Structure formats: C-alpha cells, structure tokens
Amino acid sequence: MNEGVNVGNRYQKIDLETWKRKEYCQIYRSAVQPQYCVSFELDVTNFKKYVKENNWPFTMAFIFAVTKCTNEIEEFRYRFLDGEVVLYESIDTSFTYLDKETELFKVVNVPMQDTIGKFVQLAIITAENQTEHFTGPVENDVYQFSALPWITFTHVSHTDFGNREKAQPIFDWG
C-alpha cells in the first residue's frame, strides 16, 4: 500500500484489486444516495455524571468519546481521496457550535487529542475564538458532529451536495 498525508492525517492507499470490499464499494459508490442512517437511543447517564464531575461541556466530551470509539473501528476510517480509497490512521473532528450572540452556528474543526481533558480544552478555545461561520470546505479526514440538545428525535437527514468523494460519518444527537 502507498502512504500519504492529507491535512495532517496519515493514510494508506487501498489496492482495490485485493480489497475484500471492492465489489461493495463499486456498487454503492454509483448509487444516487449511497449513505444510510442508523438511529438508536443511548443511555449516557454514567458518562454525564463523569463529565459533570470534571466540569466539561457535555457536547465537547461526547464528541471526544464518539471519535475515540470510531477511530478504533477500521471501517469508519475509510475515505475517498482523489478518486481512490484510502484508510486513515486516525480521524479528526468537525462540529457545529452555536454562537449565542448571533444565534448562528459555525463549523469548528478540532484535531483529535490523546485525552478527553486536552480535547475538551482545545475544542472550547477553538470554538470560542473562531470568528468565521465556515472556515472552508469540510475535509475528508473528519467525523462530522451536530448536537441539538434542546430537542429529542429519532431520525435526522442532512443536505446532500452530491459529492461522491465525501464519505465521512455524521453523528447527531439531541
């Protein structure tokens, strides 16, 4: 496999001829909407207690926890890059953050950290100091997050711009 770096994250190019997922990739990549949505309820009682004990914002801590878990699953780290399938060593985060003064959200990109405390601290600083609502296109080497804590829902859909190179998971909760 060939190696490379995209926006700070290392990846390996996948040899499609020997890849066990080749047929699936070819079939679903040509679909109009190749994504699917999985919704479920998750009991976060103990996690909320842990977050509160450490005085962390729940959203930032939950983004870390989900990213840590998904980075451990190889299938979540596959992406398309320049027409090829690549496997990233790790994936960073991109999340919406509500600016309370303007009541508009901004998209904030934060690199994954090795501890929840470091991540939460960096996420807070980055979100609060970022003045732009959009800093540019969301890269492939991120998981996208959107929290809607003031509502309860069991399904959500997203704007689909039709870019087949974008294959990153999107996590939402409320």
Which residue ranges define each predicted feature?
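Acyl activation and transfer enzymes in specialized metabolism, enriched
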Residues: 47-73
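Helical lid/core segments from catalytic subdomains that handle acyl or acyl-like groups
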Residues: 99-158
